[in-house]
């Protein structure tokens, strides 16, 4: 049967929970434009905010838009990496929108993030497998953390 659902409309950057026995891996609200607001962690949301949904926006703005996308993904990653350590979920349509800048942004983020100490870049299946073997009380404690909250880990993970 189904073990996870990655189609949720979005939520804050917190540890996943199960809904009706299925892991919910939603898109996440990430800092956008240096934290002016939060935007969903999906290429279409950047496209909508940057070029009003036009898939072939102004090419002169591609470098800026790509950097904004990288910065948003990295801000979300860093918030959790130095905080709650919640997983980062990124949605992508594998399209060539705005000159392929969203795919290029993900390539940059992967090269930066997946090499960091203590980070594992995994599939949803691998994450579900790992989540399934964690102690329920540990997951509950993790879910209670603010994304940027770096706890006393000895009190959370026992």
Label every model-predicted segment.
Residues 1-81, 135-146:
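Active-site-adjacent pocket scaffolds in enzyme catalytic domains
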Residues 4-15, 71-158:
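C-terminal domain-boundary segment and adjacent tail
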């Amino acid at each position: 049967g189904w073990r996870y659902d990655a189609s949720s409309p979005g939520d804050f950057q917190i540890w996943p929970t199960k809904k009706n026995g299925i892991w919910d891996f939603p898109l996440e609200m990430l800092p956008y434009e240096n934290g002016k607001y939060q935007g969903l962690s999906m290429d279409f949301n950047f496209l909508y905010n940057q070029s009003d949904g036009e898939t072939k926006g102004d090419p002169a703005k591609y470098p800026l838009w790509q950097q904004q996308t990288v910065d948003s993904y990295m801000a979300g990653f860093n918030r959790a990496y130095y905080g709650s350590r919640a997983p980062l979920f990124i949605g992508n349509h594998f399209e060539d929108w705005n000159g392929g800048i969203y795919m290029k942004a993900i390539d940059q983020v992967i090269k930066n993030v997946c090499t960091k100490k203590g980070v594992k870049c995994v599939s949803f299946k691998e994450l579900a497998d790992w989540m399934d073997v964690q102690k329920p009380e540990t997951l509950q404690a993790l879910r209670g953390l603010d994304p940027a909250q770096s706890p006393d880990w000895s009190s959370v993970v026992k």
